[in-house]
Amino acid sequence: MGMQMKNFKKMMTLMALCLSVAITTSGYATTLPDIPEPLKNGTGAIDNNGVIYVGLGTAGTSWYKIDLKKQHKDWERIKSFPGGAREQSVSVFLNDELYVFGGVGKKNSESPLQVYSDVYKYSPVKNTWQKVDTISPVGLTGHTGVKLNETMVLITGGVNEHIFDKYFIDIAAAAADESEKNKVIYNYFNKPAKDYFFNKIVFIYNAKENTWKNAGELPDAGTAGSSSVMENNFLMLINGELKPGLRTDVIYRAMWDNDKLTWLKNSQLPPSPGEQQQEGLAGAFSGYSHGVLLVGGGANFPGAKQNYTNGKFYSHEGINKKWRDEVYGLVNGHWQYMGKMKQPLGYGVSVSYGDEVFLIGGENAKGKPVSSVTSFTMRDGNLLIK
């Protein structure tokens, strides 16, 4: 997508009791083949029949599926997405159809990057896509979503559409003038978190009625690039950015009951071994295995939090982004460091099936997309990584 996409990718990278770790044998976990093409900043979901669907991001308009119940598991290409290439969409299965919400991309080769508020759905039976006659109440990029039931999805977080779009309009206007471009970049990043107006409203979309509902607000500031999971009517909203380059280590917890969201006591991710504080993560993988919430990977800027505390709003200036390989687990109500992944990785797709958490694609420590598929499983108190 040219220079604007390069600036977008650069900017978005600024915006996703120790237990033993073991490499599993084939008897412990499912082995899945690599995705046909590398995937980062994509999206994915699993249906009620154990079929995983992933696509978009660096895969462009391509989508693939794999049936976990088949003896011989292979990725199959499905019909391409009609809404154009985009990154950071959210997808869930509702009423046996795959819904895709928002994202960021270019409407044509000449236009600047922009936030989308559209919704598409895919029918596995017909292998067809359809644009849904609705738009989200706010533009959706950097948002997160979890399925509440067969008809409803909860969506929250994300960047402010107008502020985000204006940044790329200004970058495009600067064109080849490096001095002007650097000025735009500095002015964009050198602001306090509150000035970015990240979305803190919680929206509920009902696919059966094709309606949106305001379900309240996050208990604190809005975030972008958070990870989220839902288990037994309890929502966990994990870390994310408070502003580009600055993460939070907070995990919000809420209960969904009688169509109402009640916020409970939050918690914090512990520091990594050898580090004084937890910077927080964006683009992390997450999912449950045998009742343990596992969070791994993602990326941050070590030292940005201290800079911000000291009054430096451009908190990540001069700091190299660090992709993470640590895995944490919420065991008996307490967060613990569990061990390390096979490699630092973030901004991929997390999908849970049974007691396995699949980590599909992602971005490695060189900023490159990968096509690998790995998994987390808890067994006998150990974290198994395959």
From Swiss-Prot:
Reaction(s) the record says it catalyses: N-acetyl-alpha-neuraminate = N-acetyl-beta-neuraminate
EC number(s) on file: 5.1.3.24
The Kelch repeat ranges on this chain: 51-95, 97-149, 151-186, 187-232, 235-284, 306-355, 357-386
Subcellular location: Periplasm
Pfam entry (one): NANM
Presence of keyword 4Fe-4S: no
Keyword Transcription (UniProt): no
Keyword vocabulary terms for this entry: Carbohydrate metabolism, Isomerase, Kelch repeat, Periplasm, Repeat, Signal
Gene Ontology MF terms in the entry: racemase and epimerase activity, acting on carbohydrates and derivatives
GO CC terms of this entry: periplasmic space
Domain of life according to the entry: Bacteria
InterPro entries named in the record: Kelch-typ_b-propeller (IPR015915), NANM (IPR056734), NanM_proteobact (IPR019936)
Signal peptide: 1-29
Main location class: periplasm
Active site: 241 (proton acceptor)
Family: Belongs to the NanM family.
PANTHER family: ACYL-COA-BINDING DOMAIN-CONTAINING PROTEIN 5, FIBRONECTIN TYPE-III DOMAIN-CONTAINING PROTEIN
UniProt function note: Converts alpha-N-acetylneuranimic acid (Neu5Ac) to the beta-anomer, accelerating the equilibrium between the alpha- and beta-anomers. Probably facilitates sialidase-negative bacteria to compete successfully for limited amounts of extracellular Neu5Ac, which is likely taken up in the beta-anomer. In addition, the rapid removal of sialic acid from solution might be advantageous to the bacterium to damp down host responses.
Subunit record text: Homodimer.
Protein name (database record): N-acetylneuraminate epimerase
Organism of provenance: Salmonella paratyphi B (strain ATCC BAA-1250 / SPB7)
